């Protein structure tokens, strides 16, 4: 685990691809791309099944290990919302519903038309950018704030 001091905030970069903010008991991550494998398979691209389950299990484990109370997804919660099936939504709802955290999302470029899916899964949707504890949270890294944490480039922290 790598400790990062960013402005007046202190984070831990975790091996599970999350950024942990212990003072607020918040996990930040980006680019889950739920449904990516199924979308590729629907398009005739042979990719193995189960990737999203692994990603959600990794997130669940991170929540349990840190005792997080809040999770922020910094964009691309979904890969291609028009191809999301009822079966996928049922599976994701079952995986996420047992986690006792507040879920927040800033919708990314892959999340067009994702609003109803995100709210069904219990996510609070926030605009891009959103100011959180003096740090701009965004999906795209091109906003002009001094301190920002962004996804999109899987992921990045930019120091100015």
Descriptions of predicted regions:
Residues 10, 25-27, 131, 136:
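Short, solvent-exposed loop/turn motifs
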Residues 27-29, 36-131:
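Core catalytic region of metal-dependent phosphoesterases/phosphodiesterases
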């Amino acid at each position: 685990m790598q400790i990062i001091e960013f402005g007046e905030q202190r984070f831990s970069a975790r091996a599970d691809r999350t950024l942990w903010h212990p003072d607020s008991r918040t996990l930040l991550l980006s680019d889950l791309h739920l449904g990516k494998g199924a979308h590729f398979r629907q398009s005739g691209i042979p990719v193995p099944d189960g990737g999203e389950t692994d990603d959600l299990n990794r997130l669940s484990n991170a929540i349990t290990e840190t005792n997080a109370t809040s999770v922020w997804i910094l964009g691309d919660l979904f890969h291609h919302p028009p191809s999301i099936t009822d079966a996928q939504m049922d599976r994701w709802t079952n995986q996420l519903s047992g986690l006792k955290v507040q879920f927040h999302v800033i919708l990314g470029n892959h999340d067009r038309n994702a609003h109803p899916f995100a709210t069904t899964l219990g996510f609070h949707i926030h605009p891009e950018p959103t100011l959180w504890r003096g740090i701009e949270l965004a999906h795209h890294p091109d906003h002009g704030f001094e301190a920002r944490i962004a996804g999109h480039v899987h992921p990045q922290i930019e120091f100015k």
